[in-house]
Regions:
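TRNA-recognition modules of translation machinery and tRNA-sensing kinases, especially anticodon-binding
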Residues: 1-190
Length: 190
């Protein structure tokens, strides 16, 4: 029953946003993409979570979420460096939500992308990534879609497909899984 429901949602979305939309085209981009795509988009440098471990109970937490919870949303950790987040957690004595203690490891950046390699010779392999989102495939294939469809700007590209994230705490229902479906539609305008 679940797969039928999911497929119905995908079909309805595709029909509404791709087939019934004027000047909109569908795409099925690659799941494995060259590392240069992710470097150019900034993903290799910044698609990570700031993680801290509680030394007492060994639980792992996102530093930004600890700050948001402690400040009740009045502090924006997105504009803070790791050092500033550590300083806030220390100065405001932010405790572990599991055990209540205040004994943290330093923040470490946890890479959210799955990395693998392509090639048969070990010393000549190229690094590639499983896509953490589908949007980059739409951007990379913009000219291919425009040329093959003779589309004039503005036009849209829609895609339904799997994305993969190296979640540190998978299993938080449907929100923090390592493999999931995305439905994205990008509009390209002047």
């Amino acid at each position: 029953v679940g797969v039928e429901l999911k497929n119905n949602v995908k079909r309805c979305w595709w029909k509404r946003f791709v087939q019934e939309s004027d000047n909109s085209y569908g795409l099925d981009a690659a799941i494995l993409m060259n590392s240069r795509v992710w470097e150019a988009s900034g993903h290799t440098a910044s698609f990570s979570d700031p993680k801290m471990d509680c030394k007492e109970c060994k639980s792992r937490h996102r530093a930004d979420q600890l700050i948001e919870a402690h400040s009740h949303g009045t502090v924006n950790p997105d504009v803070m460096t790791n050092e500033e987040m550590e300083q806030y957690i220390e100065e405001h004595h932010v405790n572990c939500p599991i055990c209540g203690k205040h004994n943290w490891t330093p923040i470490r950046q946890f890479n959210m992308m799955f990395e693998t390699s392509r090639g048969v010779v070990e010393d000549a392999k190229d690094k590639i990534y499983l896509r953490p989102e589908t949007a980059q495939g739409e951007y990379v294939n913009f000219l291919n879609v425009q040329r093959t469809t003779r589309a004039k700007i503005p036009f849209g590209i829609g895609q339904v497909g799997k994305a993969f994230r190296n979640e540190i705490t998978p299993g938080n229902f449907i929100f923090r899984t390592i493999e999931f479906e995305q439905m994205e539609h990008q509009w390209f305008c002047k």
